[in-house]
Amino acid sequence: VIVDNKAGASGTIGGKAVQTSPADGNTLLFSAATHVLAKQVLATPPYDPVTDFTAVARTGEAPLLIVIPPTAPQKNLREVIDAAKGGNNWNAAIPALGAPSHLATLLLAKQGNVKITMTPYRGTAPALADVAGGHVQVLMDSIISLQGMARAGKVKPIAVTSTQRSGVAPDVPTAVESGFPGMVYNSWYGVWAPKGTPPDRVLALNKAINKATAGLARAGAFTALGILPVLESTEQFRQFVAKDVARSAELLKEAGFKAE
């Protein structure tokens, strides 16, 4: 397996490379949930992320970690929402438009019935640095990306967005525990092939990826990162994507988001 990291433009640079590859199952796209929202967040997306690809397999999902500056006086998510309602100008760092961090922040504003200004960044690293420095009030992103800084005390973790506490951050309560029952949002990861890839090839890839995922899960590789392994058929993956896109599109519409 040759890995070619093609980042940028909300994931569409790598996506375009795969979309225009031969539909033989030899070139695949591995991406986070950001991939399926290109049509919603980009004014001129280079493709339709759902109809121009063949869903192969979903491999895992991980909760988002909500962090605030280490010097912030708030101790939990409820206090953060109350402070935001108190007339303070609260800014949330957004590492990428259409990413789980963006959609989860919209969901938090909805669940908390509060206005939060979205501040876009070019990736998680600069967003995390500004939260650590107290320049931005809140950030949520995959627990994989934020847990290192949280453990080091560079940022203060206040909640995770899963239904249960994460094994890699057992002392951090869920947003549900903090009084926000609808604040459940996971980042997820999947594999796609170009449209037109033969069904038998897609099925073989799905079985192989599920087998590899199960093996990594048994070895503890997923648990160590806070990822929950997912073993699904291609049809289950397609149905999941349809529901996720609908949910995200609704959040963007309610927020008055305009594609850029």
Over which residues does each language-model region extend?
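Short, flexible active-site-adjacent loop segments at beta-strand->alpha-helix junctions, enriched
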Residues: 32-34, 72, 96-98, 161-164
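Hinge/capping helix and adjacent helix->loop/strand transition within the periplasmic-binding protein
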Residues: 20-26, 40-126, 175-177, 188-221
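A ligand-binding cleft/hinge motif common to bilobed small-molecule-binding domains
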Residues: 34-44, 107-111, 138-172
